[in-house]
UniProtKB/Swiss-Prot annotation:
Protein family per UniProt: Belongs to the ferredoxin--NADP reductase type 2 family.
Cofactor note: Binds 1 FAD per subunit.
GO molecular-function terms, A-Z: ferredoxin-NADP+ reductase activity; flavin adenine dinucleotide binding; NADP binding
Record organism: Rickettsia typhi (strain ATCC VR-144 / Wilmington)
Name this protein carries in UniProt: Ferredoxin--NADP reductase
Keyword tags: FAD, Flavoprotein, NADP, Oxidoreductase
HAMAP family linked to this entry: FENR2
Oxidoreductase is among the record's keywords: yes
Pfam families documented for this protein: Pyr_redox_2
E.C. number(s) listed in UniProt: 1.18.1.2
Amino acid sequence: MYNTDIVIIGSGPVGLFAVFQAGMLGMKCHVIDAQEVIGGQCITLYPEKHIYDIPAYPKITAKELIEQLKSQAAPFNPVYHLNQQAIELNKHNDFFEIKTSKNTIIKSKVIIIAAGAGAFGPNKPPLANIEDFEGKSIFYFINDKSKFLGKNIVVAGGGDSAVDWTIALSEIANKIYLVHRRDKFTAATESIRQLRHIAETGKIELVTGYQLNNLDGHNNELQAVIVKDLQNNIRKLDANILLPFFGLKQDLGPLANWGLNVKLQHIEVDNYYYQTNIKGIYAIGDVAHYVGKLKLIITGFAEAAHSINHAYSRVFDGKALHFEYSTNKYEQKQ
């Protein structure tokens, strides 16, 4: 059994920043993550994707952001329990006891849930024999964009992932078709502006008003993607790669059975300290829900700071926290 001050569930950017914030206040952390590596969705789904709304970074890849956050938290020696889920919660007086899928038991006074989308998987389009092409011609996540050099690509979807990856891959692909059932996209305004600008050059073709209908290929290699509009007009797009981006299926898994207030796979918290209905358990980042919630990494960073500062008095039995600027606190830790 391990004893610590705080258990953080999730090692994405918000969870890692919570480790740093806790360390600055002298609190030790153990981190549980179901993935084999630190970084959450940033590493598992889009390590090479650029992020543009992190302060002081005009752009930074998801992988670079995680590396920076790991380095920032490293001086406080967090203990990581990877490739295992938090499955069981018990409470003993003022302490929580968590058991993982690998029978690891951790005792702490505070739990911070920063689980992002929880256990996630792609929403797959209902296409016949799609599994024959998965992993060779059809991909739901991009870990290495260099494999798409010179390819003819169909990207399907209208949200941030579809638009952002269309823009990013246009630099290396031979041709990209972006297929969306509507004329309007739901991505960031600036991303849509960039998309339409590149489309004017002919590098990207916007195939709007169409949906995926069928696949054409043999020996697990795609040769064309068939799309159809509402009037049943058919187009055959010559392509050897299909990237469907229709969002993720979210599943809180065992966390949903912990007695927390859960709504639509999100954990409800107050909008002051991001504490759940169980005192001592907080939820931050994309997994948390409250009125006015904004799903941004920077919002999760602020939630981490608030929740960790509020948790201080619980960890140290009611001791008051006296505010200090990070310059002074960090120098004292070194």
